[in-house]
Regions:
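Conserved nucleotide-sensing/catalytic segment adjacent to the nucleotide-binding pocket
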Residues: 2-34
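Acidic, Mg2+-coordinating active-site environments of NTP-dependent enzymes
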Residues: 22-31, 48-202, 278-282, 286
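Conserved helix/coil segment N-terminal to the catalytic DExD/H
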Residues: 37-44
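Inter-motif core of Ras-like GTPase G domains
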Residues: 44-56, 227-233
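Glycine-centered, small-residue-biased loops immediately flanking beta-strands
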Residues: 84, 228, 306
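Active-site beta-alpha connecting loops in nucleotide-dependent enzymes
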Residues: 186-189, 211-213, 218-283, 291
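Conserved phosphate/oxyanion-binding catalytic-loop motifs
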Residues: 205
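C-terminal structured "cap/appendage" subdomains that terminate the fold
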Residues: 281, 287-309
Length: 309
């Protein structure tokens, strides 16, 4: 693994990486393509065969200006010359509209919708969650099956459905796809569980948008033991979209206990960022700009049965 400073590197780095992969015998590459990458032409010249659309939620409005503009930049990938398969989350309103557009405008493209809804081609028919993972049953054009995963959250069930759609569309057998997906381990810092018998369950997640925080909290509320409390320790980044700060605060109120602290303030004063969050948090919250102090407070105050996000 090599560290990268951007989700999608600059065009020279992208082409260099692909060249090196091919020289080493790689036949397939999975790439996360950011809206910035599409807008700044970082992936021009890349021959994409299949693409997944996961969601459109508030982020990067300091760059794109509006949700509509943000969505249309993401949609560019699905009009890529030579693209053969589009696998789209139709539980997402923009995704559902995009799938409809593509079916009408691109008869050459195989479009598969995935999600919990009845209209999904790759449909999640059953979902059961626990603190150590989840069980997901799927009905697909390639058959039905079930996968037991160590991942957490309905959004990760959707992600598994997306992987099934992309891989099966490319000719991989459903049973082998499900067996492979069962082996996936959570990425560090993404619903990453820290468990000790004498301490509360601590879950570390990257959630830096209102939607992501809302989904992380909903996931943990589903698995929280009866009588236990869910603590949310969070902050917002500096020198980025200020409009999402009160939305993050509002999302955090779905937890039982809220702790507000710093999260990469960059060049802004940490307390100024916190002051932008606080008006949306009606319940009493513990506030401390020092992140270590805030985390230590939550761990010290939580019971063994509690969960800390």
């Amino acid at each position: 693994l090599q560290e990268s400073t951007h989700t999608t590197p600059d065009p020279v780095a992208v082409q260099t990486l692909l060249h090196d992969f091919a020289r080493q015998g790689a036949e397939n590459v999975a790439m996360e393509v950011s809206s910035h990458g599409l807008d700044q032409l970082r992936v021009n010249g890349v021959a994409f065969k299949s693409a997944i659309f996961t969601n459109l939620t508030r982020d990067h409005l300091d760059y794109h200006g509006s949700m509509q503009a943000y969505g249309e930049i993401k949609a560019r990938l699905f009009y890529w010359q030579g693209l053969q398969h589009a696998v789209i989350n139709i539980d997402d309103p923009f995704g559902a509209a995009l799938a409809g557009r593509l079916k009408a405008e691109r008869p050459d493209l195989a479009v598969y919708g995935y999600g919990f809804g009845e209209q999904a081609d790759i449909r999640i028919t059953q979902f059961a969650a626990a603190s150590d993972g989840m069980s997901v049953a799927l009905d697909t054009p390639w058959g039905s099956g079930e996968v037991r995963s160590r991942l957490l959250g309905r959004f990760n069930a959707q992600n598994l459905a997306a992987c099934v759609g992309l891989l099966c569309a490319n000719g991989y057998p459903l049973d082998k796809v499900l067996a492979a997906l069962a082996q996936i381990r959570p990425a560090t810092g993404r619903m990453d569980c820290i468990m000790r018998p004498d301490a509360p369950l601590v879950v570390v997640d990257y959630a830096h948008t209102p939607d992501a925080l809302e989904k992380a909290i909903a996931t943990l509320n589903e698995i929280k033991p009866q009588g236990a409390r869910l603590w949310c320790v969070f902050g917002c980044g500096g020198n980025r979209d200020k409009g999402k700060r009160p939305l993050m605060g509002a999302a955090a109120t779905a937890a039982d206990k809220v702790v507000i602290t710093s999260d990469n303030p960059r060049l802004e004063a940490p307390q100024a960022i916190i002051d932008d969050i606080l008006p949306a948090v009606p319940q009493p919250a513990f506030v401390h700009p020092d992140r270590r102090t805030a985390i230590e407070y939550a761990v010290a105050e939580a019971s063994v049965q509690d969960i800390i996000l």
